[in-house]
Curated annotation (Swiss-Prot):
<keyword id="KW-0812">Transmembrane</keyword>
<keyword id="KW-1003">Cell membrane</keyword>
<feature type="transmembrane region" description="Helical">
    <location>
        <begin position="65"/>
        <end position="84"/>
    </location>
</feature>
<dbReference type="GO" id="GO:0005886">
    <property type="term" value="C:plasma membrane"/>
</dbReference>
<dbReference type="InterPro" id="IPR025353">
    <property type="entry name" value="DUF4257"/>
</dbReference>
<feature type="transmembrane region" description="Helical">
    <location>
        <begin position="39"/>
        <end position="61"/>
    </location>
</feature>
<keyword id="KW-1133">Transmembrane helix</keyword>
<feature type="transmembrane region" description="Helical">
    <location>
        <begin position="4"/>
        <end position="23"/>
    </location>
</feature>
<keyword id="KW-0472">Membrane</keyword>
<dbReference type="Pfam" id="PF14074">
    <property type="entry name" value="DUF4257"/>
</dbReference>
<protein>
    <recommendedName>
        <fullName>Uncharacterized protein YtvB</fullName>
    </recommendedName>
</protein>
Length: 111
């Protein structure tokens, strides 16, 4: 039951921080809209990314106290995209492959 409470708290805090990060990045709260080619989710995208990042970080870190939980949720929710990219980077390193950035840098330019 303790883990469920931690995940719920991480969802709430991460979602709020994701929305605050969206406002800081864009300068305003953008509503979802549809264009001819795609659906732009606006602030919902950053809300979902912040929530997901904070859940993943809390589940992987397993905080001992409430203060650690809140701090981890705030940090991961605010920088949600960077946290998710770091999880992808760690997964690539653990699978024995090189990260995509290093593969791109080692290629020689065509002549």
């Amino acid at each position: 039951m303790k883990m469920l409470h931690q995940v719920l708290i991480a969802c709430v805090i991460g979602g709020i921080m994701g929305i605050l990060g969206h406002v800081k990045k864009r300068g305003r709260l953008e509503k979802p809209r549809m264009t001819k080619r795609f659906i732009y989710l606006g602030f919902l995208e950053d809300w979902f990314i912040g929530m997901t990042a904070s859940i993943l970080l809390v589940l992987s870190a397993d905080p001992d106290s409430g203060i650690q939980l809140v701090i981890l949720s705030i940090i991961s929710g605010y920088g949600g995209e960077a946290v998710l990219r770091s999880f992808d980077f760690v997964r690539e390193l653990n699978s024995g492959g090189e990260p995509a950035e290093s593969k791109r840098q080692t290629k020689t330019p065509p002549e």
